[in-house]
């Protein structure tokens, strides 16, 4: 795959007031953001990002999974329309489904296999096929050495992890210390979620953990290892902190978290040193998300002003 900077940004589009895609791509370039996550193959965005050298993660949305799982021909058609049609785009991954849950999980591995087969047949096997999971699939996340999937998640994650190991692809996970903390603020010091703890909070054998981000990443590694995925890398497909709409959701806290995230991911975790490929959620505040914190994850307002200053 193309070389990657450790930090990208998720370009979500659940809003009716965003700038044109070509303008957004210019904002990525101006701010030195080298990687972009798209949740679906948006034509305007893919046309605009072609030839820029920006690495792209493109989603095959949840509503196409059953179709992609049902037939290799459907997957080949999807790849032709959404990948091969954009030869100038530096595609890095196709992310098949985002936080797929319930009965739909039965389509995950068949869809991933069919998309992978279609990419290989098109001479595009360097574009890896993965899926993006929620941190909620971890039944145990602390200490990281005890990390494991919930019983329900283990049933579908075993085959997912084994497919990723076979194809040398990473698992993508959406990791939100804010949400874990806000769910039960009395159970955890906010500094541990915010990259602001003064020392080791969780001691795990020889390893000391100062922040919940590292704890969660390493718990995912332990959980994957229990299902034949000890060779699989983790990519953080979303992380961030909201600037409004909820408890401790302020521009100052959001800036503190995201700036520390950017500065931190180049170093890795206690158990897995080295850069962690990470995508900040999100480029913009999105006004068609649920009210509250969901509308307030953006680095920018739709008018292109910074919600708070940040340095990539």
From Swiss-Prot:
Give the pathway listed in the UniProt entry for this protein. Answer: Glycan metabolism; beta-D-glucan degradation
**Which PROSITE patterns would you find in this protein's record?**
GLYCOSYL_HYDROL_F17
List the active-site residues.
99, 238
Q: Which residues are glycosylated?
A: 196
| Top-level taxon in the UniProt lineage | Eukaryota
Q: Which Enzyme Commission numbers does its entry carry?
A: 3.2.1.73
Arranged from A to Z, the UniProt key words for this protein are:
Glycoprotein, Glycosidase, Hydrolase, Signal
One Pfam family, short name:
Glyco_hydro_17
**GO MF, one example:** licheninase activity
The residue ranges crossing the membrane are none
List the GO biological process terms. carbohydrate metabolic process
Q: Which SUPFAM superfamilies match?
A: (Trans)glycosidases (SSF51445)
Catalytic reaction list: Hydrolysis of (1->4)-beta-D-glucosidic linkages in beta-D-glucans containing (1->3)- and (1->4)-bonds
Function, in words = Functions in plant cell wall hydrolysis during mobilization of the endosperm in germinating grain or during the growth of vegetative tissues.
Q: Which PANTHER family match?
A: GLUCAN ENDO-1,3-BETA-GLUCOSIDASE BG1-RELATED-RELATED (PTHR32227)
What the record says about family reads: Belongs to the glycosyl hydrolase 17 family.
**The protein's name:** Lichenase-2
Query: What organism, scientifically named, is this protein from?
Result: Hordeum vulgare
